[in-house]
Amino acid sequence: MSKLAEKLKAVAAAVASIEKQFGRGSVMTLGGEAREQKVAVIPSGSVGVDRALGVGGYPRGRVVEVFGNESSGKTTLTLHAIAQVQAAGGVAAFIDAEHALDVSYARKLGVRVEELLVSQPDTGEQALEITEHLVRSGAVDLIVVDSVAALVPRAEIEGEMGDAHMGVQARLMSQALRKLTGAVSRSGTCIIFINQIRMKIGVMFGNPETTTGGNALKFYASVRMEIRRTGNIKDGDAVVGSKARVKVVKNKVAPPFQEAEFDLMYGSGIHRVGEVLDLGVATGLIEKSGSYFSLRGERIGQGRERAAEWLREHPDVLEALGKEITGTSALPSSPAPVEVAA
């Protein structure tokens, strides 16, 4: 018997022993077909962000972290993702640890608030236990936790003001993520943790910025996205929105360090039409000659506003352009694992 045959026989015996002890499917090969399966995703609601993520959206069965400064658009970005999930017939949950969810604003972004699962927990432990229950149900597609900084440990809430609680929140996050990641992968749920930026004390060289909750989330997150406000959008003297830039600083499902820029309009969120128009020009799908915009040889408007108005009046063209820009045409289903025959 050759060495290869002996190895295969030993592997088959080991697999049979493992499955006898832990159940069928404990050990498996991915198989030839599974290697070619696309990553199942949830659209972010932003064409640019979907493109920057490299797979067309937030990956299912993974942990995602969105962090940034105050009023940079973190919650708005996640509410757009919730609206996308609901539009596709999925179920979404919002763990409002900050107790600051604006229901009327969420409705303006397309969220069906009457169908949204909302929890406003009293402690960090309660928030993460609720999250675990929702994940293990296998019925929730997207869970947003807003925010890590507001996941206050029970010991801190029950203690006196001014008491020192060094590392309690970091230990809480580390324990929770150890329990959650396996269940998240099996259920296909995507969890988005919103996080805040803090400044390290005494840093003389390098970046003094860090995120709350310790290092566990940095390790367990498959995708980490930094969102920053880069400027204001004015209508005359009135500020009507802000410009935002998203940078994918960590990505386990595609090449990292991709960026996306978009306009956040007050009261309506991401300016999708303007984003598709700008990216269409950047990718060559829309031709721009002087102030004129053309699509496949047909002139659609003079000036950005008129071209955007034309796209707004043709939603089917807008949707098709968005899919061409991101390179995706449909939501892939979760790949089925292939078991090893004993």
From Swiss-Prot:
<dbReference type="GO" id="GO:0006310">
    <property type="term" value="P:DNA recombination"/>
</dbReference>
<keyword id="KW-0227">DNA damage</keyword>
<dbReference type="Pfam" id="PF00154">
    <property type="entry name" value="RecA"/>
</dbReference>
<comment type="similarity">
    <text>Belongs to the RecA family.</text>
</comment>
<dbReference type="GO" id="GO:0009432">
    <property type="term" value="P:SOS response"/>
</dbReference>
<dbReference type="Pfam" id="PF21096">
    <property type="entry name" value="RecA_C"/>
</dbReference>
<keyword id="KW-0742">SOS response</keyword>
<dbReference type="InterPro" id="IPR020584">
    <property type="entry name" value="DNA_recomb/repair_RecA_CS"/>
</dbReference>
<comment type="function">
    <text>Can catalyze the hydrolysis of ATP in the presence of single-stranded DNA, the ATP-dependent uptake of single-stranded DNA by duplex DNA, and the ATP-dependent hybridization of homologous single-stranded DNAs. It interacts with LexA causing its activation and leading to its autocatalytic cleavage.</text>
</comment>
<dbReference type="GO" id="GO:0003697">
    <property type="term" value="F:single-stranded DNA binding"/>
</dbReference>
<dbReference type="GO" id="GO:0140664">
    <property type="term" value="F:ATP-dependent DNA damage sensor activity"/>
</dbReference>
<dbReference type="GO" id="GO:0003684">
    <property type="term" value="F:damaged DNA binding"/>
</dbReference>
<dbReference type="InterPro" id="IPR049428">
    <property type="entry name" value="RecA-like_N"/>
</dbReference>
<dbReference type="InterPro" id="IPR013765">
    <property type="entry name" value="DNA_recomb/repair_RecA"/>
</dbReference>
<keyword id="KW-0234">DNA repair</keyword>
<keyword id="KW-0233">DNA recombination</keyword>
<dbReference type="InterPro" id="IPR027417">
    <property type="entry name" value="P-loop_NTPase"/>
</dbReference>
<keyword id="KW-0067">ATP-binding</keyword>
<dbReference type="GO" id="GO:0005829">
    <property type="term" value="C:cytosol"/>
</dbReference>
<dbReference type="InterPro" id="IPR020588">
    <property type="entry name" value="RecA_ATP-bd"/>
</dbReference>
<keyword id="KW-0963">Cytoplasm</keyword>
<dbReference type="InterPro" id="IPR003593">
    <property type="entry name" value="AAA+_ATPase"/>
</dbReference>
<feature type="binding site">
    <location>
        <begin position="68"/>
        <end position="75"/>
    </location>
    <ligand>
        <name>ATP</name>
    </ligand>
</feature>
<dbReference type="GO" id="GO:0016887">
    <property type="term" value="F:ATP hydrolysis activity"/>
</dbReference>
<keyword id="KW-0547">Nucleotide-binding</keyword>
<dbReference type="GO" id="GO:0006281">
    <property type="term" value="P:DNA repair"/>
</dbReference>
<protein>
    <recommendedName>
        <fullName>Protein RecA 1</fullName>
    </recommendedName>
</protein>
<keyword id="KW-0238">DNA-binding</keyword>
<dbReference type="GO" id="GO:0005524">
    <property type="term" value="F:ATP binding"/>
</dbReference>
<dbReference type="InterPro" id="IPR023400">
    <property type="entry name" value="RecA_C_sf"/>
</dbReference>
<dbReference type="InterPro" id="IPR020587">
    <property type="entry name" value="RecA_monomer-monomer_interface"/>
</dbReference>
<dbReference type="InterPro" id="IPR049261">
    <property type="entry name" value="RecA-like_C"/>
</dbReference>
